[in-house]
Every structure is written in structure tokens, then in C-alpha cells.
Amino acid sequence: PPTIITVAAISIITNLFDTFDRLMEFSKKHLNDPFILEGVQAVSARDAILREIFSNSLAHRDYSTGYVAKFVIEKDRMYTENGNLSHGHGELKLDGFEPFSKNPPIAKVFREVSLADELGSGMRNTYKYTKMYSGGVPEFIEGDVFKTIIPLSSAATSMVGPDGNQDTPQDNLQDTPQDNLQEKVNQVVYEKII
């Protein structure tokens, strides 16, 4: 199995709205937001994807299990995992997907405060914006643990400056063992939601 190096791990023990906000802040800190046009309008495909996967994870999670929900950013993908009251097993496909609300009261509140749209739109939006963001196709895997996998391109995760490839002589003079550790740490980001 691959070794996972943790960049930052925080436990979030708060209400659903603050959890959503903290996940968004954390992700924006660790993922680039390349310039993307949708027609003539600039859009943040990164933020659109994050909104969908976080609201899905929080609104459809099985809170009765002891499974700790996760959000992980790796070099070539990011994914969420959460306990699930499954209605089948295996990969969900956009063309054969039948949406099912697992926590209708939470989903309703999320729609009311604009953290979610109509049932099933999250999967369509995630496909659309993942194609724009990384050129890839997301995976949604249904089971006792629900997993959403978003492929990432190098544009989404590359670092600029002392931790990337654009060092200046001044940066090199100031490199310390801590900088080397930070470079290793930047390989993977792990987030736990409790």
C-alpha cells in the first residue's frame, strides 16, 4: 500500500454549516483554482466541485455508524469517504443513476440555504466541473462506505515558490530541514470530519 504523508489533519467537531465552511477553507488553501471560462463567464470549477462533494458527504452521511468521514487530497486525486446507508453496491453511473435522499431533513435544510440544489444535481454538476477542472471523470462508489473520487491534474496541485520548482537563489539560501519536510508534507492532504 502507498505511504500517505499528512499535510494537515484537523478534527472538525461542530455543526454542519461550520463543518462545510471549514472544509471549503481548508481545500482552497491546498488546491489551486485555475482560470476557467464557462461560455463568457469565469467560473471556479474547484469551488463548484468542493461544494457538491462536501454537501453530498454531509447531507447523505450515515451518522449512526462509527465510521469517521474523510476528505483526502493526493497528488493525482482527492476523495471523500463517509458512512452510508447504501441502496446498492458498486460504482454509480450518471446515465443510470437514481437519486435517493438518505437524510431528507438535512438535505432540505441544505437546499434552503443554497448548499445543495435539487436531488441528483450534485452528481451532474460534479461530472461537469471535474471535466473542466482536471479533464477527468469523477467516480461515485456506493457501499457501506460511500466514496467520491475526483481526479486531479498537475495544475490543481502544483505549488509555486519555495515549495515548487520556481526557487530563486534567495529562496535556496533560506532553505532549512523544515522546508524539506514541508515539501514532503505537501504531497498529500488529509482531512477528517467527525
Stretches with model-predicted labels:
Residues 1-194:
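C-terminal regulatory or interaction extensions
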